[in-house]
Amino acid sequence: VSVLMSEIIAHHLKDQAEIKIYDPTSGSGSLLINIGTSVAKHVKDNNKIKYYAQELKENTYNLTRMNLVMRGILPSNIVARNADTLEDDWPYFEENDPINTYEPLYVDAVVSNPPYSQAWDSKNKESDPRYARFGLAPTTKADYAFLLHDLYHLTPDGIMAIVLPHGVLFRGGEEERIRKNLIENNHIDTIIGLPA
């Protein structure tokens, strides 16, 4: 699956001089590594690829950083965070002046394989810019919360690939409203169903 996702993203980004890639549920970093390898075939300078990773579990967060460096990626091209993606969005700010230097992270490609149908706390998230436009995923299933987080962090010409359970295509309620809104706003290009 990661090879297919990587090739689709690399094809979309092939003419860009500088590329930012983000995995908000990076695990060991394998998706970032595969995408970076595919994108590197199309760029003149591999050092123009910047990798952003966020991971909840500290041990796998450390694996992400280690695996990227072991693949020859310069530490200066790796920005990794140990945090909860749905609770702690990734703004950029300078530590000594967070209020005046705040800006959200926008990237050329987002790739993720978030935990399936995980419960999440949507309390006080109605005005969160990641969800305000399309709605809140149900508290019992965070699949669309992850998807909307990913979508929010894309540049206007960016591309996203996310692995989700088939249920996101058929479930009703708030998920149906989010799905309909995404389709009506032309935010879904392709869905690839794979056997279990």
Locations of the language-model features?
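Short glycine-dipeptide loop
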Residues: 154-160
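Conserved ATPase-coupling elements of RecA-like P-loop NTPase cores
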Residues: 119-124
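Conserved S-adenosyl-L-methionine
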Residues: 2-109, 117, 128-130, 145, 187-196, ...
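Glycine-rich S-adenosyl-L-methionine
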Residues: 130-154
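Short, flexible active-site loops
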Residues: 131-134, 160-167, 193
